[in-house]
Amino acid sequence: MLFDVRDTGARLKPGSGIRPTVTNVDLRFHNDNSYNETPPEFVCLLCLHPAMQGGISQVMSVATAHAALEQRHPELMARLYRPFWYDRHAEHQPGEPTTFAAPMFERGADGTTKARLALSEIHAGYELRGERLDNETAAALAAVQSVFDQPELHVELGFAPGQIQYVNNRATGHARTEFTDFPEPERKRHLVRLWLRDAGRRGYRG
């Protein structure tokens, strides 16, 4: 599935269907499509035009993040393996629920740790449902954010025209810094994203 990643001038609002990928905002560590039943296993980003300033890509290993959480917040690990509510960004049929429940971490069939990192979608999911975060849930999300904020746990990668970045979407989290575009429309930041799966149906929901 192909998608153009560029700033459209839209602004984020829970339930609106507007995703950070069509804005220029700082996009924290996440796994693409975490709010879907079957997120893609791999994400590819082709750079057509980089930003004038910012838009730096950051990548963090899920195993590294998980180990840091186990070391620093062992009392919260059980909560991270229980479901959270995610905003589905209006990517569903009319009449379907606007939120999706899933744990942030799970063990794959091969024993590896897989993730659904998407803190903004989780906060928006609870807002859409009119539910307040209980103390344990709020503490768990804050703990994950604290790990995201550790620069030594991730790598930074710039983009140049023609470069392609491939990441394992369930084994790594990726992020993007806020960016400023060139004033000329033809020079604005533009990436083309490709989602890939090894299994499941060919449609969006897999």
Regions found by a protein language model. Give the residues of each.
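Active-site environment of non-heme Fe oxygenases that use a 2-His-1-carboxylate facial triad
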Residues: 2-166, 170-206
